[in-house]
């Protein structure tokens, strides 16, 4: 975009299955999705999606991909059945076949009884379900879902995530899901790609990436600050939230070092266990390594990035 490089030296391979696309606001996620859909042309480089060239075969790519955009792409004056049917016709489906499929997919996404209502009367959850129906009418091999659970209440969100899970586990489809809701990504996706300033910051299996920095969680009673200072003085890496501390599990001696420090400062450890990191934890650790001070993913995913100007490393952890 003019002098600004939205994507730079981005080299990655995404395999079949479910992949979460993550990154701060302005990281290049939308540009990446539009590029692989063939909607915009990359100024350099090359790529393929399902074996099709992103530069010359955009129409072929879009015929095999279902795209559920974040923005409102529905006609409020159309009945859901005709909106979904129209999506099929845009993809070249016979009108009779498109109508038959529209009934099927609207039933699948839970709108079978509401299919003749105008979309303008739908709730946010029903509109999201309609967009999902539009994206799968042609039975695509890959579904790109951009913020699929955004703005949904708990019930609608659960239904959306369960439906995407079912598509991956039982429908033999691949899903690429961009979302700021880490719990949703972790439930649906096995793999993740994290973009930062248009570059690849991390890629791999979520479980493998979470295992890079294992931690021991301790619940402390008495002299918590002294214990924190003592552990840090001998080189242990500590994250603290009140009386709960997480210590980087560097080797087999870490536990004994923690206990020795607690004894020295007369602090009681009421509980100690291996901490099971979440995708949220992983995201924060990676972004902190890139120079940002964050408390939650919301700080970066839904608001402008502020922090030191640090270039993303070429690659971090995991498999492709």
Predicted region positions:
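ABC transporter nucleotide-binding domains
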Residues: 1-196, 202
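Structured loop/turn residues at secondary-structure junctions
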Residues: 2, 114, 124, 223, ...
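Short, surface-exposed acidic/glycine-rich loop or hinge patches that mediate macromolecular interfaces
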Residues: 52-55, 221, 252, 277
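Alpha-helical elements of the RecA-like P-loop NTPase motor core of helicases
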Residues: 76, 183, 229, 256, ...
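Active-site-adjacent beta-strand anchor residues
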Residues: 77, 220, 248, 272-273
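A short linear hydrophobic-aromatic micro-motif
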Residues: 110, 235-239, 268-273
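ABC transporter nucleotide-binding domain
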Residues: 160-250
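C-terminal coupling/interaction segments
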Residues: 250-320
């Amino acid at each position: 975009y003019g002098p600004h490089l939205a994507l730079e030296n981005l080299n990655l391979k995404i395999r079949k299955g479910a992949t979460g696309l993550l990154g701060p606001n302005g990281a290049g996620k939308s540009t990446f999705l539009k590029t692989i859909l063939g909607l915009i042309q990359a100024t350099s480089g090359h790529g393929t999606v399902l074996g099709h060239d992103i530069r010359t075969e955009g129409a072929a790519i879009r015929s095999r991909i279902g795209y559920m955009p974040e923005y409102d792409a529905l006609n409020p004056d159309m009945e859901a059945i005709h909106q979904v049917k129209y999506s099929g016709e845009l993809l070249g489906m016979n009108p009779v076949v498109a109508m038959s499929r529209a009934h099927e997919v609207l039933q699948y996404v839970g709108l079978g009884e509401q299919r003749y209502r105008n979309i303008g009367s739908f709730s946010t959850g029903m509109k999201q379900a309609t967009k999902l129906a539009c994206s799968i009418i042609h039975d695509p091999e890959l579904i790109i879902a951009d913020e699929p659970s955004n703005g949904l209440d708990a019930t609608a969100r659960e239904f959306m995530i369960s439906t995407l899970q079912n598509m991956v586990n039982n429908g033999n489809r691949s899903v690429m899901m961009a979302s700021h809701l880490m719990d949703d990504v972790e439930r649906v996706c096995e793999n993740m790609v994290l973009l930062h300033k248009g570059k690849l910051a991390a890629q791999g299996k979520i479980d493998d990436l979470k295992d890079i920095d294992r931690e021991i969680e301790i619940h402390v009673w008495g002299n918590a600050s002294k214990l924190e200072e003592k552990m840090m003085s001998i080189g242990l890496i500590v994250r603290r939230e009140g009386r709960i501390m997480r210590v980087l599990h560097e080797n087999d001696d870490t536990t004994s070092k923690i206990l020795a420090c607690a004894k020295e400062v007369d602090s009681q450890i009421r509980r100690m266990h291996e901490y099971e990191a979440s995708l949220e934890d992983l995201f924060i650790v990676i972004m902190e390594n890139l120079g940002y001070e964050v408390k939650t993913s919301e700080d970066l995913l839904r608001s402008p990035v502020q922090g030191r100007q640090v270039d993303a490393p070429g690659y971090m952890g995991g498999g492709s």
